[in-house]
Amino acid sequence: MNFTYINASTGTSEKFPNKTITHFLHTHLEEFGDTEEDIQKCIDYVLNPNKGGQIIIGTNEDKIVGIVILNNTGMKDYIPENILVYIAINNSQRGKGYGKKLMEKAISSVDGNIALHVEPNNPAKALYEKLGFTNKYLEMRLIK
């Protein structure tokens, strides 16, 4: 598995344009995903030098196997410095260890702690726990 890193320093990738990234994530996140417009906003955040983060694209034989996006929160003193916003593995490539490899790259690619949100019925929850993520808080939201 090879990895391509995209961030504010590298800028966008000719090989993996934003539209390719948004479409891949939208397709492979399935019921756990967001609209392509919202995914694009997350990419824009990564590419903004005043905000930041990291996009990591995992490939095998030049085909995208998985993508992870982390945003820098800028709030390291009171919440984790990074939030893992999206991770998706190609439906046909699941169960081969690519998710674990991509998560390990994501963890090692950023400084500081990482938070993520995962739905209780998401199969990826077990992987996150194996990698050391814990459920420290119950998140509550007021939808207005």
Identify the role of each PLM range.
Residues 78-91, 116-119, 138-141:
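Conserved acetyl-CoA binding element of GNAT-fold acetyltransferases
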Residues 93-105:
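Conserved acetyl-CoA pyrophosphate-binding loop and the N-cap/start of the following alpha-helix
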Residues 115-129, 133-134, 141-144:
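Conserved beta-strand-loop-alpha-helix junction that forms the acyl-donor binding cleft
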Residues 33-55:
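Active-site rim helix/loop that mediates acceptor-substrate recognition in acyltransferases
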Residues 18-37:
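Helix-loop element at the rim of GNAT/NAT acetyltransferase active sites that forms part
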Residues 1-2, 61, 108-114, 136-137:
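Short glycine/proline-enriched coil/turn segments at helix->beta-strand junctions
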Residues 55-57, 63-72, 83, 88:
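Conserved beta-strand in the GNAT
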Residues 1-23:
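Conserved N-terminal entry element of GNAT/NAT acetyltransferase domains
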